[in-house]
Amino acid sequence: INNGYGSWAYWNGGAAVSNYHSTIAEGTSNTQLSIPADLAAHSGSNFLMIFGSIDGYNAPVLDFKDGKAHTMKGLWITNGTYFLNVMANGNDFCAKAKSSTQISVVFEGFKADGTTSTGTVKYTVQDGTNSLKSWQYVDLSSLGEISSLKVNYEASEDMKGKYGYNAPAY
């Protein structure tokens, strides 16, 4: 996790283990670590909530604790309630999703040097007005052996503003 800002690291992109749930209507910045109340964690009672941004420097990077390269088979993803509420209703920072809205999560693998990319895998989490609201498996095996995984977003122009990506990046 990027800890360049000390205790504010999560603000700058990062990951947090959570077990919070809320309704989509309650999805605000106060419930940013929540998934829908009717959706259980995929396995166990906790899940990892990742926060990032469309710019390169705020993207969270997950490193393997042992410092060795590994081949990741894949992972399960879903959207958080903050993202889902904004896509359905908009907020002060972002308009609600429309038919042309496209948002994908981009997973990028890196070799031990931290700069050599092994490739990317994209998964669409918002297609027009349709939001991902269930757990979906993302196959990451094509990234090969990686020492770290960067998680970022790619979005259509209607989700960007003067300062970049405006939708919640959770």
Could you say what each language-model-derived stretch is?
Residues 86-105:
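Short coil-to-beta strand junction motifs in C2/discoidin
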Residues 5-8, 73, 132:
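Intrinsically disordered regions, especially transient/low-confidence alpha-helical propensity segments
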Residues 104-170:
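Terminal, low-complexity interaction segments
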